[in-house]
From Swiss-Prot:
Protein function: The secreted form behaves both as a cytokine with immunomodulating properties and an adipokine with anti-diabetic properties, it has no enzymatic activity, partly because of lack of activation by ATP, which has a low level in extracellular space and plasma. Catalyzes the condensation of nicotinamide with 5-phosphoribosyl-1-pyrophosphate to yield nicotinamide mononucleotide, an intermediate in the biosynthesis of NAD. It is the rate limiting component in the mammalian NAD biosynthesis pathway. Plays a role in the modulation of circadian clock function.
Localisation per UniProt entry: Nucleus; Cytoplasm; Secreted
Tissue expression notes: Ubiquitously expressed in lymphoid and non-lymphoid tissues.
Sections of the chain in a coiled coil: none
Pathway(s): Cofactor biosynthesis; NAD(+) biosynthesis; nicotinamide D-ribonucleotide from 5-phospho-alpha-D-ribose 1-diphosphate and nicotinamide: step 1/1
SUPFAM superfamilies: Nicotinate/Quinolinate PRTase C-terminal domain-like
GO molecular function annotations of the record: cytokine activity; identical protein binding; nicotinamide phosphoribosyltransferase activity
Binding site for beta-nicotinamide D-ribonucleotide: D219, R311, P312, D313, G353, D354, G384, R392
Keywords noted in UniProt: Acetylation, Biological rhythms, Cytokine, Cytoplasm, Glycosyltransferase, Nucleus, Phosphoprotein, Pyridine nucleotide biosynthesis, Secreted, Transferase
Protein name: Nicotinamide phosphoribosyltransferase
Pfam families: NAMPT_N, NAPRTase
Taxonomic placement: Eukaryota, Metazoa, Chordata, Craniata, Vertebrata
PANTHER family reported for this sequence: NICOTINAMIDE PHOSPHORIBOSYLTRANSFERASE (PTHR43816:SF1)
Claim: Nuclease is one of the keywords in the record: no
Amino acid sequence: MNAAAEAEFNILLATDSYKVTHYKQYPPNTSKVYSYFECREKKTENSKVRKVKYEETVFYGLQYILNKYLKGKVVTKEKIQEAKEVYREHFQDDVFNERGWNYILEKYDGHLPIEVKAVPEGSVIPRGNVLFTVENTDPECYWLTNWIETILVQSWYPITVATNSREQKKILAKYLLETSGNLDGLEYKLHDFGYRGVSSQETAGIGASAHLVNFKGTDTVAGIALIKKYYGTKDPVPGYSVPAAEHSTITAWGKDHEKDAFEHIVTQFSSVPVSVVSDSYDIYNACEKIWGEDLRHLIVSRSTEAPLIIRPDSGNPLDTVLKVLDILGKKFPVTENSKGYKLLPPYLRVIQGDGVDINTLQEIVEGMKQKKWSIENVSFGSGGALLQKLTRDLLNCSFKCSYVVTNGLGVNVFKDPVADPNKRSKKGRLSLHRTPAGNFVTLEEGKGDLEEYGHDLLHTVFKNGKVTKSYSFDEVRKNAQLNIEQDVAPH
């Protein structure tokens, strides 16, 4: 985004319409509104509905929002004027809080008198715990806390992508360990194919970065710049890719020249891994005849560092992977690893990048295990399912007011709708703690002030227009590691 486009962002216009009218709705003499964000627990979910439980979430992406949209001088005379005009037309009435915004402009030079406290980025926290809190630091600006709910709750997206990606990593880790005895290459087992499947460039950057919290393979280039700009890494880049064919680079040779296309591409990329989509006409013929016979001599001469990666891209994902492995297993020398599972030679691998979501992934690796194929043989690509087939409802991401000060008196507030106990919200000032047993617990009603519970895991990350604490992407990744990764030392 260039500087001109960035300057156009107006926080006064980045809220739900109804919030423009809320400053008139709070009790008179309200001086503080304190709200919090959580991924609510579903206590009454029908267990048959959803295969994956999502019992814990990866907290990621707030740092990006704070830095891109909320820090610094975000209120100007021009932006107030612009908002005033838009809302006059939008509501057909003068409901806009011009006085309140002018106060922020004059008293704070357009910096937001808000404090945000949050759990460290990359933290893995069970559902139903507080993840961040927001409160006004100036009693005149009680209305500002929930004005910024809209933009802050958009953190649901990176949180959900990172969480779903990590749940898939758990599946891959479990089956890789069971079928090979180690976790080598785990971080390259799920590759991001989602750039074209998301709704915008910004979505691509945010979503790709969230997947890279857990993995290192991506074709969504937008994630790299976002991480470098808003998080930073010790490595030159946080994500990697390899040369790969698409259908056009095969079909452009004509139907009778698929072998020539394959030969040309593997020769062009002889010393690095290369992925070749092989289902333009007949995936099984391609594996058996072209790769297994006609071009076999070119494949067996490749090094371990530069395998051919055959990519099927149609049909039932499980059936296709098993049949491809079966054909390749008859055409190339297969060995048995220490766990008793079949392994293709190191110069040959398979990537399944079609129809992969968290449910089909589980089915494919389970099916492979049953047929005694090691997960070492394959990797996966996921696009729309990884970055777009997600909503705020998946983890029940919610922002609610829990504490207000009116007439100088603090009051613990909550909602508890009669028709849905899942929507009950927490009360009072909140803090997050670890019990001696290592479990997370959210304390309500300011009870975290008592020393017996240990220190609060929520840290101030934003105060009065300044980002006060930041996390590097390396820290985020370390926080989000699987327990199994810490237990199994890499070879």
